[in-house]
Amino acid sequence: MTTLRLLISDSYDPWFNLAVEECIFRQMPATQRVLFLWRNADTVVIGRAQNPWKECNTRRMEEDNVRLARRSSGGGAVFHDLGNTCFTFMAGKPEYDKTISTHIVLAALNSLGVMADASGRNDLVVKTPDGDRKVSGSAYRETKDRGFHHGTLLLNADLSRLANYLNPDKKKLAAKGITSVRSRVANLTELLPGITHEQVCQAVTEAFFAHYGERVDAEVISPDKTPDLPNFAETFARQSSWEWNFGQAPAFSHLLDERFTWGGVELHFDVEKGVITRAQVFTDSLNPAPLEALGERLQGCQYRVDVLEQACESLIAEFPAQKGELRELAAWMAQAVR
């Protein structure tokens, strides 16, 4: 009986793919070696310990319908589109060894005619006249009895969008999360014009089989077909939830300030696990009462745009004369925290 398992996702949904990865990892026998191949539509994927408000231009992501997905491994933020091929290698201990999976990916690239090297920062690079350029980045996760190595290969990614979504607005944000390190990157199409996702998947699959000396049929996974994945619905619900993607952010503080025609406003938020634990409001408005009430109302609320807007709207009944100011404040906050 083979010890290998090959899964290929037909879905471009990042929450679906990460939930599949999590289910397989939790439930695989410790003797199994797994390769999972997948790709995501427009998504910023952040590391387990990262702060999305610090790492990402969340306002632009929302405008462009780019999803946020938090993975279970560490490391930095990356932008995925259909120009990326994603891979995950899993194995039980003591056999799990990220140097083996790195070797498999390098062998796959070599079979396609690309000579790449492993760098010291979990990346694969190619040498160009302009210096080393990154074509693959990886992250890792280990538990007591198993581990996985997952990463991306840049095929034809829109590298301009990479900068758009991973360069955050200049916010006054003091945060404790892990900050992503930017790298010089290159697409494989610059080296192999016309290379496709299917060709790369085939090369990685063949290198995987060659390393272990076994072959196995691929299992194609889609939202309509999730074989042998107990508890998938619960895992997907968690992976796609605001509480996981935003609420798991490390504690941080956010200072917002603006001057309106009716006065200046300064907001100080302390946020833990996506919830406002302290809200301080300072203003030179001639009528500070609605703003003081807002500070009290926001304490304990989720740090999300719709909640902030609802808090302002709920104060209009209590302070009808300040309806215009409260709606102006709500619109500004909605832009400032995205």
Curated annotation (Swiss-Prot):
EC number in record: 6.3.1.20
BPL/LPL catalytic domain: residues covered: 29-216
Binding, ATP: R71, G76, A77, V78, F79, K134
Cysteine pairings via disulfide bonds: none
A GO BP annotation: protein modification process
Highest taxon of source: Bacteria
A GO term from the CC aspect: cytosol
Binding residue positions for (R)-lipoate: K134
GO MF annotation list: ATP binding; lipoate-protein ligase activity; lipoyltransferase activity
UniProtKB keywords: ATP-binding, Cytoplasm, Ligase, Nucleotide-binding
InterPro entries referenced in this protein's UniProt entry, alphabetically: aa-tRNA-synth_II/BPL/LPL, BPL_LPL_catalytic, Lipoate_ligase_A, Lipoate_protein_ligase_C, LipoylTrfase_LipoateP_Ligase
Enzymatic class: ligase
Family per record: Belongs to the LplA family.
HAMAP family on file: LplA
Assembly and oligomerization: Monomer.
Other noteworthy facts: In the transfer reaction, the free carboxyl group of lipoic acid is attached via an amide linkage to the epsilon-amino group of a specific lysine residue of lipoyl domains of lipoate-dependent enzymes.
Function: Catalyzes both the ATP-dependent activation of exogenously supplied lipoate to lipoyl-AMP and the transfer of the activated lipoyl onto the lipoyl domains of lipoate-dependent enzymes.
Protein name, entry field: Lipoate-protein ligase A
Organism expressing this protein natively: Salmonella dublin (strain CT_02021853)
Lineage: Bacteria, Pseudomonadati, Pseudomonadota, Gammaproteobacteria, Enterobacterales
Protein encoded by which gene: lplA
